[in-house]
């Protein structure tokens, strides 16, 4: 009788790499020796045998992968192992990612099923994997595969099969293909080359059956996939002729089946700029082997047209059975200067027109927009916030008056200290020329009214173009132009953050200033700057006036002539910058865009910005902190009204690429841009653009 021997069967549970058969990979490069304490990691464990004799040793390979930064050394041990089974603690040195652990099984281990927990620890981070262990009965034979290894094996031709039988001599050994005998090999170690070329494509289960004294001992099964079908490219992204690709996007190619990662090289994919210059890149294959990702080493340049050429993949990249790709595509996509945030935005279905859009970026870096739009009977104010994937409407349509036919228009937005949007607008009262102003604050679920703003409204008196900013101490500052039928002037109020009523700021009215019209307000620190267009009787011209804290006319004079719509912003040194349209007759045809800034004791010389466009209108300024300032406006270039954008670089306004238009067809004019800086100091722009049926809001961000 042979000595009492036990059978040990181990298999990995929950370790998917141990159950996926791909060709063995060469050792990857060692990790950067610079380590991060408590770095996160994962590991896989693969036993070298599935059965082992008692008193013997089971070798188990482990492979380490750092989640992000590389960590230090990793110590391995078994957690509370059963009696007779032990692993001497082993430390994987810093910088290494592979090791072979030796698990000893004592000769006296009691037969039965056990659960082992293998643990790796680096710093304070521990990860575990579970192994099942079965100790067999005395007298059992040990049957182990050598090749194929655990998991799935792929073949398109001859396949080498090798295995061992230990623990005594077998009277008969058979290789089973599913339930039938494939061959009865002899000799030890046992070896057989299976020619699969005559087999039908499909999946087969192979196992080894050894017989002795009427007892049958069977190996663990091996899954063999016979595959002679060439893989194909199922899909790819970005799509052919895609027009809105981000500078950080990768190219993803999906195949019809898993590919051999060892057949994939960086040279297999061609990636070039529009000028034909090769783009440095890296390539990787997904864990399931079906997705090839091409990642440029640096962000793509914008604007540009990128070419992707996969023809080198043909016959070079193969599936796990060795079948090569027979055809592969080439295509192009465009990386524009600007990317849309969602598509066209409209609150009302049908042939409606959105107007007066205003954009602000909240304290979490998310754009918020407000605009006016008619539902066919009443024009309301709408507010929406970008979620990161879509525009979410904030509450119901806003109107200060309930009566049918009211007309809400010209909203403005501010974001308060609690990151809540506050919106103001003017609205027709239905009493002659009368218009009133209204203010609402978003609570997170609904809109609440702010205290009444004490402006007179009658059949001939009304307020227009309300402006709202958040100043020092998180106070709200409101300004508008008040018209009385004969004249108009700037009015201003403050709502303290802890107050319940608006305080009249009584803005100064310089002598000879008549008929104030377009208005823009900006805040910085303790300063509030109010810019407005006004007829300057002393200079006999309509110019731009800028008030500092509602109390003094900066520079003692107005700027420009024939001034119309304008925009003001404040830089980090609390200097106001102002841009305005000069138009002798009609801005939509003869408007010219100018700018100036305050230089401590006087204004810089007003300078023309719109050198390459006509019919300029609706400027919008946004000043960066550590990033270039931005000026956007609506103008006509190449016979199309678009949004033009310039950036302050090297002490001058320089165009940021080509004019922007959301619609590709001609005859789709873009109006009224509103620009703000995002959390990274980069511009986000909203405007309205019309086609033959309606006008919608569009929002774009810089592609950076």
Set out the residue ranges of the language-model regions.
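Short, compositionally biased P/S/T/A/G/V-rich stretches that sit at domain boundaries
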Residues: 31-36, 41-49, 137-154, 227-245
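Short, surface-exposed alpha-helix to beta-strand junction/turn motifs within ectodomains of secreted
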Residues: 247-284, 313-318
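Extracellular, repeat-based ectodomains that mediate carbohydrate processing or recognition
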Residues: 163, 336-704
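Short, solvent-exposed loop/linker segments at beta-strand-coil boundaries, enriched for Pro/Gly
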Residues: 79-89, 179-183, 241, 269, ...
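Short, surface-exposed loop/turn segments at beta-strand-coil junctions that are enriched for proline
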Residues: 104-111, 195-199, 299-301
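Flexible, low-complexity linkers/stalks enriched in Thr/Pro that connect modular domains
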Residues: 134-138, 195, 222-231, 331-337, ...
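Long, low-complexity serine/threonine/glycine- and acidic-rich segments characteristic of extracellular
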Residues: 93, 98, 138-228, 309
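Long beta-sheet-rich domains in secretory-pathway and surface-associated proteins
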Residues: 20-139
């Amino acid at each position: 009788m042979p000595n009492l021997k036990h059978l040990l069967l181990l298999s990995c549970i929950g370790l998917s790499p141990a159950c996926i058969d791909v060709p063995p990979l060469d050792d990857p490069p060692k990790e950067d020796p610079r380590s991060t304490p408590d770095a996160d990691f994962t590991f896989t464990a693969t036993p070298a045998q599935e059965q082992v004799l008692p008193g013997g040793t089971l070798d188990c390979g482990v492979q380490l992968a750092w989640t992000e930064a590389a960590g230090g050394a990793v110590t391995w041990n078994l957690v509370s192992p059963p009696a007779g089974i032990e692993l001497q603690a082993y430390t994987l040195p810093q910088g290494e990612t592979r090791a072979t652990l030796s698990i000893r099984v004592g000769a006296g281990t009691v037969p039965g099923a056990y659960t082992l927990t293998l643990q790796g620890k680096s710093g304070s981070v521990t990860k575990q994997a579970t192994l099942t262990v079965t100790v067999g009965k005395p007298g059992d034979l040990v049957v182990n595969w050598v090749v194929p290894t655990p998991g799935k094996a792929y073949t398109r031709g001859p396949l080498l099969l090798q295995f061992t039988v230990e623990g005594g001599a077998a009277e008969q050994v058979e290789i089973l293909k599913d339930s039938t005998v494939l061959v009865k090999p002899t000799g030890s170690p046992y070896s057989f080359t299976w020619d699969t070329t005559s087999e039908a494509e499909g999946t087969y289960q192979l196992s080894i059956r050894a017989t002795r004294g009427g007892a049958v001992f069977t190996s663990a099964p091996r899954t063999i996939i016979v595959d002679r079908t060439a893989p194909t490219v199922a899909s790819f992204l970005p799509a052919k002729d895609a027009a809105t690709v981000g500078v950080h996007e990768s190219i993803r190619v999906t195949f019809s089946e898993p590919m051999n990662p060892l057949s994939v090289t960086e040279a297999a994919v061609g990636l070039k700029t529009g000028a034909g210059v090769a783009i440095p890149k890296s390539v990787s294959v997904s864990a399931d082997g079906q997705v090839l990702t091409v990642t440029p080493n640096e962000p793509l340049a914008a604007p540009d047209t990128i070419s992707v050429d996969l023809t080198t993949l043909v016959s070079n990249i193969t599936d796990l059975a060795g079948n090569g790709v027979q055809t592969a595509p080439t295509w192009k996509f465009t990386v524009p200067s600007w990317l849309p945030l969602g598509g066209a935005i409209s609150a009302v279905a049908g042939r409606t027109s959105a107007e007066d859009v205003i954009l602000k970026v909240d304290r979490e870096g998310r754009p918020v927009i407000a605009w006016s739009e008619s539902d066919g009977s009443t024009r309301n104010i709408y507010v929406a916030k970008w979620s990161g994937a879509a525009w979410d409407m904030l509450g119901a349509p806003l109107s200060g008056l309930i009566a049918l036919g009211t007309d809400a228009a010209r909203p403005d937005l501010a974001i308060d200290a609690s990151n809540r949007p506050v919106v103001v607008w003017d609205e027709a009262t239905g009493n002659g020329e009368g218009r009133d102003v209204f203010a609402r604050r978003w609570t997170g679920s609904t809109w609440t009214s702010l205290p009444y703003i004490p402006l007179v409204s009658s059949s001939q008196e009304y307020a227009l173009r309300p402006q709202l900013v958040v100043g020092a101490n998180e106070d709200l500052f409101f300004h508008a132009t008040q018209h009385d039928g004969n004249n108009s002037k700037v009015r201003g109020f403050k709502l303290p953050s802890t107050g319940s009523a608006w305080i009249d700021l009584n803005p100064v009215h310089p002598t000879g200033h008549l008929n104030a019209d377009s208005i823009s307000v900006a805040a910085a620190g303790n300063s509030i700057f109010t810019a407005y267009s006004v007829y300057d009787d002393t200079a006999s011209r309509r110019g731009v006036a800028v008030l500092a804290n509602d109390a003094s006319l900066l520079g003692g004079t107005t700027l420009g002539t024939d001034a119309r719509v304008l925009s003001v912003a404040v830089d980090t040194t609390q200097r106001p910058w102002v841009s305005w349209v000069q138009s002798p007759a009609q801005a939509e045809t003869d408007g010219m865009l100018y700018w100036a800034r305050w230089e401590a004791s006087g204004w810089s010389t007003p300078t023309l910005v719109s050198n390459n466009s006509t019919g300029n209108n609706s400027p919008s300024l946004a000043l960066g902190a550590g990033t270039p300032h931005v000026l956007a406006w609506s103008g006509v270039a190449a016979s199309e009204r678009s949004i033009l954008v310039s950036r302050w670089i090297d002490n001058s306004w320089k165009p940021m690429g080509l004019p922007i238009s959301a619609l590709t067809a001609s005859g789709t004019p873009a109006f009224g841009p509103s620009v703000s800086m995002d959390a990274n100091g980069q511009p986000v722009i909203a405007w309205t653009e019309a086609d033959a049926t309606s006008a919608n809001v569009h929002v774009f961000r810089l592609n950076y």
